[in-house]
Amino acid sequence: MQAEICKTDIPHMLEISDVVHEGKSQKSFFFNHPMECKPGQFVMVWLPDIDEKPMAVAYHSKKEFAFTSQSIGVFTNALDKLKKGNKLGIRGPYGNSFSTKANACVVAGGVGLSSVSTLIDALKNPSVIYGA
């Protein structure tokens, strides 16, 4: 099983292994598929007949990965209706990373914290300022 899913124009259809409710309108979608990515990278998420959008990788390991979404529009409302066992298309990871060698202060708010969670995990001594 390759860790780099697909960097072509064709999304790889993956089954949702778990859905975690993170708040009133936020959910994390987990996939039993390895993901090698660096802090700040994202995947393209494709919902057939709806659209394709970039989503930051919120969690990754040698066995699984996840992204977190907040329902605020047509695409994310459709995503919110998906359940464990449903499939969607994934391409990536894409994007540039950040240096994790120096100390850093990470500032995030609301669901935006999920987009920097891999950076926080990679930093040796992070200071995190979080607001709702």
Label the model's feature ranges.
Residues V74-A132:
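FNR/FR-type flavoprotein reductase catalytic core
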Residues Q2-K84:
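Ferredoxin-reductase
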